[in-house]
């Protein structure tokens, strides 16, 4: 009898053609004889579907999604999530859930790949077997990407631990891992069907276009900057931000990224929805669309642990009709003003109100705006529970294909081509409601276009857990966050670029009455100055007069004043050529002898 592997079995739920009813229930962990589980394609499919439970977790958008020019923590400075979100790392508090989850998924994928490769099936079953094998390759590669994004060089294995008997593994050069991931994703793309083939029932599983999109993402990271050190000496003096040393391979990687995106674009199965708002209303109400290309499924009591919409949503009072939503993440105040006038993405991405106990919409002040993309009042109901809202996580959207394509062409050619400009403009025009006259002039030089991409990704993917490591792969994390903190002080003091911002906003309070709420933002009139008499008159007329630098009455993060605690605590651990990569948690090193002496050299 062959070795016993730890596998995951999965039960399927019914699928709806127009609704994203979840394709999996919570897996139950069971021991199976590997010979028996891979006897039939249907049994093997359970193993592959089980891999998806370990491709994402809350840490990826929570601790590791904060600390950017978009997002900050709302928790106390003594809280480990706040510390990680502000670059106050130590090996004792370094996030470990992502590390262990990604390796669990890799082990499941390795088991699946080995088992599937050993199967003999009929010609009629071969396409499905290929699809399953492609999924396993893609999952393994994506999990390694998430490990490298945050931990740099990590242990690397493509064989099941149960097969090799190796429970000790050292760090492997990330360039070797990236090249392995690219090979895996190229293999996956060759095996997987397009969504239109009808074989993949949901965007919560890999299709050919999803594999190509993740291939492009991996290639851009592999070509980009990262914090590196000498893996022979682990000398602190060797730590530096750099690209991989082989310039020809870097150029090849940009071509790989561009070509992968072009395949998706040329196929024509995916497209931008006309309205940015619809993307997230569909997500929250579990509807499929052609823009969402890969989602992490959340449904029911057992497979719903990411707390999307609860940890990273708007504030909703426990007594309101929507049930409690208690965000532990807030909007970096300057982000609001980063958006250009007329960019409709701002009010979808940033919610300017919370829901009080009486269901009233109370406007937020600058310090307390919340994440709007996953707001609970847009859902069809409360969901499974207030902290299990049944909201999928968006891993890949078509707009990312367009922006990665534009970026890769600019890097490959050292200047934007016409195709690169057109791809960027397609995303930007949608952001302005389809009005191309509002998007401004697209730069035609390399650096100007690169800066445009850096900004556009901020506007398009706010709070989708891409910004932090995007800034790192561009080599500008420290510089961007240092500038953000300077801007925040100017905003607090109403000086410099923020000299003419609103000090007051006046609005009418309205009452929410149902789920699938049509409201996007509370309308207001902004004022630079208001006399006490004017304020009194407006209040008597039924308006609320809000001092924008004061604390909010809901989800308060305190006042916004120059150099106060809100500002001084933000990014307080930031240190160039140190915090771009996290230390590996002590608890992980303790159980892996291969990592002894291989901690991040500056920790």
Model-derived segments and spans:
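Short edge-strand/loop segments of extracellular domains
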Residues: 72, 160-164, 262, 422-433
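Short coil/turn linking the two alpha-helices of tandem helical-hairpin repeats
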Residues: 148-150, 155, 196, 218-230, ...
């Amino acid at each position: 009898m062959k070795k016993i592997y730890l596998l995951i079995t999965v039960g399927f739920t019914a699928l709806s053609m127009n609704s994203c009813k979840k394709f999996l229930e919570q897996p139950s962990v069971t021991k199976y004889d590997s010979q028996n589980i891979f006897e039939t394609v249907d049994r093997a499919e359970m193993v592959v579907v089980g891999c998806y439970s370990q491709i994402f977790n809350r840490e990826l958008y929570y601790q590791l999604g904060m600390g950017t020019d978009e997002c900050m923590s709302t928790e106390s400075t003594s809280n480990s999530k706040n510390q990680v979100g502000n670059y106050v790392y130590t090996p004792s508090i370094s996030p470990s859930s992502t590390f262990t989850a990604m390796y669990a998924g890799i082990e499941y994928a390795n088991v699946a790949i080995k088992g599937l490769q050993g199967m003999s099936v009929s010609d009629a079953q071969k396409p499905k077997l290929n699809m399953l094998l492609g999924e396993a390759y893609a999952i393994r590669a994506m999990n390694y990407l998430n490990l490298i994004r945050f931990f740099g060089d990590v242990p690397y294995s493509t064989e099941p631990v149960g097969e090799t008997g190796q429970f000790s593994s050292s760090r492997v050069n990330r360039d070797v891992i990236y090249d392995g991931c690219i090979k895996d994703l190229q293999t996956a793309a060759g095996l997987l069907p397009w969504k239109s083939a009808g074989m993949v029932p949901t965007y919560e599983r890999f299709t050919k276009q999803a594999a190509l999109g993740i291939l492009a993402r991996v290639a851009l990271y592999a070509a980009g900057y990262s914090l590196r050190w000498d893996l022979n000496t682990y000398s602190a003096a060797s730590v530096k931000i750099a690209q991989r040393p082989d310039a020809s391979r870097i150029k090849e990687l940009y071509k790989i990224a561009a070509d992968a995106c072009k395949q998706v674009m040329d196929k024509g199965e995916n497209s931008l929805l006309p309205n940015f708002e619809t993307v997230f209303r569909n997500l929250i109400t579990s509807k499929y669309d052609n823009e969402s290309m890969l989602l992490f499924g959340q449904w029911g009591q057992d497979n719903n642990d990411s707390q999307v919409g609860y940890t990273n949503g708007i504030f909703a009072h426990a007594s309101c009709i929507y049930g409690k939503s208690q965000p532990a993440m807030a909007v970096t105040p300057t982000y609001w003003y980063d958006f250009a006038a007329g960019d409709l993405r701002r009010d979808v991405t940033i919610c300017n109100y919370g829901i009080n106990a009486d269901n009233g919409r109370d406007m937020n002040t600058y310090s307390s705006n919340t994440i709007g993309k996953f707001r609970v009042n847009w859902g069809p109901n409360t969901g499974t529970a207030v902290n299990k809202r049944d909201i999928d996580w968006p891993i890949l959207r078509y707009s990312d294909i367009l922006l990665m394509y534009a970026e890769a062409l600019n890097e490959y050619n050292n200047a934007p081509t016409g195709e690169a400009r057109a791809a960027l403009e397609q995303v930007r025009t949608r952001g302005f409601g389809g009005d191309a006259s509002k998007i401004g002039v697209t730069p035609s030089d390399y650096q100007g276009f690169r800066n445009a991409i850096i900004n556009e990704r901020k506007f398009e993917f706010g709070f989708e857990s891409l910004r932090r490591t995007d800034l790192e792969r561009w080599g500008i994390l420290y510089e961007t966050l240092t500038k953000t903190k300077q801007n925040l002080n100017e905003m607090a003091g109403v000086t410099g670029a923020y000299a003419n911002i609103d000090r007051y906003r006046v609005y009418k309070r309205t009452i929410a009455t149902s789920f699938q709420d049509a409201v996007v933002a509370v309308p207001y009139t902004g004022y630079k100055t208001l006399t006490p008499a004017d304020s009194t008159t407006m209040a008597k007329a039924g308006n609320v007069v809000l001092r924008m630098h004061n604390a909010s009455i809901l989800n308060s993060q305190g006042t916004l004043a120059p150099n106060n605690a809100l500002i001084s605590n933000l990014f307080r651990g930031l240190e160039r050529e140190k915090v771009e990569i996290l230390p590996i948690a002590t608890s992980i090193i303790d159980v892996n002898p291969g990592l002894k002496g291989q901690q991040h050299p500056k920790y």
